[in-house]
Amino acid sequence: MGDWGLTETSMDNYEISILSHVAMSPSRHNNLMSAYSLPSSKSSYSVISAFCTEDNIPQCISYINQELGSLGLAAHIQADPPGRASLNAAPALNAMYELLQIHRRSMNNVEELEKEQLKKTSTLEHMQTSNSRLKDQLELSIREKSGLHETERQLQLKLKTLQSCLKTEKDEVQKLQSIIASRASQYSHDAKRKEREAAKLKERLSQLLVDRKDKKLAIEMLNSVGRSDGKRSHWKTAKATASREAEMYKSLLSDYEASQRALMLENAELQKVLQQMKKEMMHILSPCPPLNRGGSAEESQELGDSDREERSAETSRETLDQSCEHAREQLTNSIRQQWRKLRNHVQKLDNQASLVQNQPPSNAEVIPLETHEHEVERMRLEVQQCKEFIHAQQQLLQQQLNTSFDDETAALLNGCYTLEEKERLKEEWRLFDEQKRNFEKERKNFTEAAIRLGREKRAFEEDRAAWLKHQFLSMTPFADRMRSSSSDGQSALSVKSEPEIRTSSSKAPPVKSSAYTTFSTPKSSKSAAVPSTIDVCRTLRLIPDYRESSATEDEESWLKSKSKVCSSDLSIFSLDEDKNPLT
């Protein structure tokens, strides 16, 4: 039992030391560690001497009992009899055990409190972080709120402006409605007034017709023959006359509608013809590939075109004596024929200009055949003379080599002959080089003259084609639209031709330059009056001259109306003037 008690007390002391080591403060723990570092006897003696000595054991026991009582412990430590200075072990151990249990419970409570404190600190940190996050969110929401307030303010301003605009628009709508209502009432009053006037006019017309019938002097027929169908004629009542007037008006309206439809069809056909003429004119005036046609064929075509023009002119004069429909068809056919002739003529001019422009420079720079043959013959003679001279020299040298002389004489003679021949050959070579240089110079001059002549000829052909084209276009209905562009192109041609005329007059032979400079491109006079549409149609033989025709006054008025229609329809050619220039 004693051993067990000692082991138990030692274990309890070990646990107490561990618990005290865990629960003590750092300063107390350091003091305790320093106390443990001393020997055990000295440490126990110092601790006991600090609180209890052999003299004050009863006082210490009473003090401990009081403390245990204050702590609520039932066990009390009792002292031994006075003869023995020791304690009763069982109550002391029980008190120590209870103290250890209390200490353990307090340590557990301390650990739990520490855990709770850690939890509370973690929750506090979490709450602080959440609080900071919520503060940031609050600031962000405040900023968003301020932005929303600003947008709301802007929207309110826009709403106010829109409301003001809506108010002004409503005022304008009300004003317009009032104006429309006033005008509608005015129009209704005008319509009623017109209806009343029309009714009055109808009554007046019917009255005039009735009065005219009543005032008409005629013989009354007795026992008149009945109608062929055996029916009786209706009485001449106001209703019958009104129905007949309505039928008359209906017939007049139907006639007017039929004539209007015929005029619309005629106008559509003429517009189609003019559109086709416009397309073909734009196609012709655009650059087209050249066609190889002979001069005789072109002349025969021109003669055929002129004959056809005369025939079409005669037919156009004859058509005036026919009916209106036949005259319209003939006029359309004559327009188409004249347009075909115009197209063929413009194509022919374009082909001539393209042939002149596309002519290769080798053909334009060719030397005349007679001069070329003369120069070749002269060069052949010179080459033949040189060959004969060289052959004679070779024969003489061979003869000298074949003759038998002494070595010294032969050497002297050969030396003399070779020196003389060398001098003579040098002189001949010098003359030959000089002749060659002169010949090259003459050939170069002749080639330049031929090239210049070809260029002058080509420029002459271009000026001639441009002049013919200008003269032709000045006779067409497009003269007023082509005047500015043709004047610009013509001035460019004149500016281009003046330096060429000066160079040709200074370098070319006098006969050729005079033949070229005698031609001058005519310039369009600005003071010329612009022809009218009737003059243009008469020039193109679309309509004959009034002096030559023997038509009546009705036919003349019809021709004037047709000329007005033509002048109004010819304005469609100016639609694509900027996109497709005529020059």
Curated annotation (Swiss-Prot):
GO terms for biological process: cell adhesion; intraciliary transport involved in cilium assembly. It comes from the Eukaryota. Residues 484-494, 516-527 have a biased composition (Polar residues). Residues 285-328, 480-527 are annotated as: Disordered. Residues 108-220, 255-333, 420-453 form a coiled coil. Its main location: other. This is Afadin- and alpha-actinin-binding protein. It comes from Oryzias latipes. The lineage of its organism: Eukaryota, Metazoa, Chordata, Craniata, Vertebrata. The gene is ssx2ip.
